[in-house]
Amino acid sequence: MAKSTFMYWQKRFNRENPDKDMEEKILELRSVHKDYGYRRIHAELCNQGHSINKKKVQRIIQKLKIQVTSFTRKSRKYNSYQGTIGVIAPNRIKRRFHTSIPHQKITTDTTEFKYYEVDERGNRTLHKLYLDSFMDMFNNEILSYNITKHPSVKNILDVLDRTIKITSDCIYRRTFHSDQGWAYQLKEYSSRLKDGQIFQSMSRKGTCLDNSIMENFFSLLKQEVYYGRIFYSYEELKTEIERFIKYYNEDRIKEKLGWMSPVQYRMNYSISSDII
């Protein structure tokens, strides 16, 4: 081997990794945001004041072997439809899942999770947990939710009342969207909306795409905290769901929100409105 070639490679091996600090920063971000791909990590770095090319972030992620690998499985979707037992509202939203006005368009749905309880003899019994949540289409923020062991009218009306109160500052007439689940058809539910001068909107029967914005949130939630794991208590599963919702609202950035989290986007909108 020529001496010049030997010296070249020796210098390369002895040279300190110029990307060491950035690699450590990216590893730190991935430890907090486990579902972030290179685009979100690049946006987060830019939000923190770092100047780096998106392709370089992608190369570092590939080098560190920390590409996102989401665990998914097919599971039967929770179906609360029990036929026509009340009034079916028209589909006012019609898949227009966006508004520039906070608290104007709200959507809701219920999903279920499974967990086990083990008795003294080691026998496992399967149980279910239900999440009722309301989302603001303005910034995809989860405004309120209930986590319960059984679906009930009281639970859904409780979280509905909280959402109506939270969104009462909207100066325009509000629209609350849902599927045709049994609870949303009840007179008690529709009466509360009518009393608040709120339009009621419903998806068409068996058309989950009419509420895909909420379906996407449930899918993300389950990929992050549920699929691939087994829970052995109600409290353990409930705590994980609450942790994710807080993280989703306050920290998880979205491209459609200008790489801000739902709460950051809302606060930024509020500041801009005050200035105007």
Where do the language-model regions lie?
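Generic alpha-helical secondary structure signal
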Residues: M1-T5, N155, V159, E188, ...
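Basic, flexible linker segments flanking DNA-binding modules
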Residues: K3-I101, T207, P262-S270
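Mobile genetic element proteins and their domesticated derivatives, centered on retroelements
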Residues: F6, I26, I41, V57, ...
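Short small-residue beta-strand/loop micro-motif enriched in glycine and branched aliphatics
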Residues: Y8, N139-Y145, Q200-S203, Y227-G228
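Mobile-element integrase/transposase regions
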Residues: S51-K63, Q67-S133, L157-V159, I166, ...
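RNase H-like two-metal-ion nuclease catalytic core shared by retroviral integrases
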Residues: S80, T84, S178-Q180, L186-K187, ...
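Electropositive, glycine- and tryptophan-enriched low-complexity nucleic-acid-binding patches
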Residues: D136-N146, R162-K165, D169
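C-terminal domain-tail junction helix/linker
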Residues: K194, L220-I276
